Structure formats: C-alpha cells, structure tokens
C-alpha cells in the first residue's frame, strides 16, 4: 500500500517433482528506490506449477488481492495444477480458494483477468487456457461462481490470451 511496484514471480516446471520447493511462488517487495527484497512470510505455501498472475481488489476493501492460474501438473500433461485465490489481509496473502472451490482445478490457465463483466460494481474473473473454454466466474460478495454465457458454448480449445473491452462502445 506504499505505492511502490512490487514483483510477484510465479513458479512453474514440468520436470520438477510434485510439491517441489522450487514450485513455491515468490514476492519481492520494492523499497521505493528500485531495490527488491524477497518476502518470507507474505504468501501461503503453494507448491504447484502456475502461469498467470493477476491482481485486483475483488473484495472491495481497498487493497490488491491475487488470482494465480495453475497450469500443468508437473510430469502429467495435460492434467492441471491447482489455481489459487489469495485475499490480501493487511499485506499478508491468505489462501481463500476453498470459498470458491470450482476455481481450484478449473484447468490449465494461460491467462486470466479481473473485470466487471456484469456492471454490478465488483470484479468478476474471466480466464482461458489449454483444452478449456473461456470461463467466467461471477463475483457474489467475494465468492466466485462459474456461469455459462450465451455464445461461449462449444468453444473449447487452446486459448492463450483474453482481453476485456467495450468493443461496441455502448458503455458496458
């Protein structure tokens, strides 16, 4: 909350053993002068292979929370590794994935975004990945529920990026 840009490093590896300590993500805190220090106690233990990390204030409390999209389970392509939803509580990130259990093993996430797709003034979660369809999770007071959108049926594939924009210029 000091305004300095910190650095989150997601870990991944196909050849690493399951639960390897090398799969633990890292958070480096910027001291304001361009020097980063590795934090040792701000992230929960997460020893899985990830790919996409996004930040957004999904719970509306004024700080940035995180979603970490899991990718491949080491040594077991195309099985997905776990994804995580981390709530920022006074600078410490707590694993609250179990509040939205469908997020945990949704697929091999390539990219995710927080966006208010339904214009209800909270951040929803959209994601794409390998061997999956574009997926939307509606934010209902901090709990993410998967929804089905008309037009996204039968769209499974190898998706690698997603962008949110008002393409028709109508304000939504």
Predicted regions and their residues:
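Hydrophobic beta-strand segments that make up the repeating blades of beta-propeller
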Residues: 7-11, 66-70, 124-129, 172
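Repeat-solenoid scaffold signature
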Residues: 128, 132, 141, 153-172
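A generic tandem-repeat structural signature
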Residues: 1-32, 36
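Blade-edge motifs of beta-propeller repeat domains
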Residues: 28-48, 86-107, 138-157
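Beta-propeller blade termini
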Residues: 1, 42, 50-60, 64, ...
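Hydrophobic beta-strand positions in blades of beta-propellers and related beta-sheet-rich domains
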Residues: 7, 25-27, 66, 83-85, ...
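Short, solvent-exposed loop/turn segments at conserved positions within beta-propeller repeat blades
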Residues: 17-23, 75-81, 130-132
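Flexible loop residues that form catalytic
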Residues: 12-13, 58, 71-72, 117, ...
